[in-house]
Amino acid sequence: MQIKEHFGNPLIEQRNLFEGSSYCLMNQPGIISVSGEDRLSWLHSLLSQNLKNLAPGDSAEALLLDPQGHVEQMIKIIDDGQTSWLMVNLENSQMLLDWLTKMVFRMKVVVTNRTDEFSLVGSTKKNPEIAFLSNSQPLIWKDPWPGVAPGGYRYSTRKVNYDWFEHMVEAKKVEELLGNQALSGTMAADALRIAAGRPSAMGEVDEKSLPHELDLLATAVHLSKGCYRGQESVAKVHNLGHPPRRLTFLHLDGSEHSLPDVGDQVRVSGEEKIVGKITSTGQHFEMGPIALAVISRSVAEDVALEVLGSSGVIAATQEVIVPSDAGKVADIPKLPRLKLAGPKLGA
């Protein structure tokens, strides 16, 4: 069965997916299994999320950061009680596989590439009947967005309705399991994600991304755990500073009947200075043309924006995801200045 952007009517497919009456065969992820009795404590020590007590059948999101706290990998994790299953973007999977293999040392873990064995099927309703059973657990990843995982912190106050499940399905059984089901293309799934303000590794993450900029402290970071690469930077920005950029949702002017491209530049309306870029675009079945953009923190939250598209300038209005004042949550008291007493000169 082919992965398709749409099957002829993207907006109807999107509504069906939203209502839970269809499935989406997702772009192929890289899939890595980590088995062995040390797997959870080992992954816990390497990644941003608290994984030590992940129960069989539970899922989580975690980040692999560089030493400066920039996002290298967004990782979806399912544990079945014997094996942890990691899903990442296909183009990044070999890098993660190599790095995990290098970090094994004497830990009792086995790291294996399982990409060719599985496909990924998304829906807004969980269906254990189509998911692969491993150690009697259906392998289903539940997206924690827009909630707040234990130990997380959400900057956004935006209210969204978003339930999303990704089922690991045996690649050889996809046709059998989905052949008689209503299907939606990947454009439908992406539009629902954008409407929810949900960042993706393929769209929103670049080489400069900090978790704070994308509101990923809510779902992928446990702020009370340490000892993982990049942890000091995460804590410093969250407690004492502000992320330099912020994720925002955009309502686009649809009068030109065209969407901007990913990477198109964004500026404040009426000004020349570039303040950010488009990271994801879609046509929503209710809201019309929408996008996500990463822009400078200094851009006012209520100012109108313009997107410099290939077919012309597109007007855009913001709906705040990460606010301008995100970060600096530590309440550090200011010490009173000490007045030095002593004789005045010339007295």
What are these regions (language model features)?
Residues 1-61, 65, 69-72, 346-347:
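Acidic, proline/glycine-enriched N-terminal capping motif
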Residues 10-19, 60-74, 104-107, 145-155, ...:
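Short amphipathic beta-strand starts and helix->beta connectors
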Residues 22-24, 30-31, 76-199:
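Acidic, low-complexity central loop/insert segments
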Residues 36, 86, 124, 230, ...:
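Residue-level signal for inorganic ion chemistry
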Residues 44-52, 98-106, 239, 271, ...:
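Short, intrinsically disordered, mixed-charge
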Residues 119-139, 196-208, 327-347:
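Short, low-order "capping/linker" segments at domain edges
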Residues 160, 166-251:
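Anionic-ligand-binding alpha/beta catalytic cores of soluble enzymes and soluble regulatory domains
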Residues 217-221, 231, 235-347:
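Glycine-rich, small/acidic residue-mixed loop/short-helix segments
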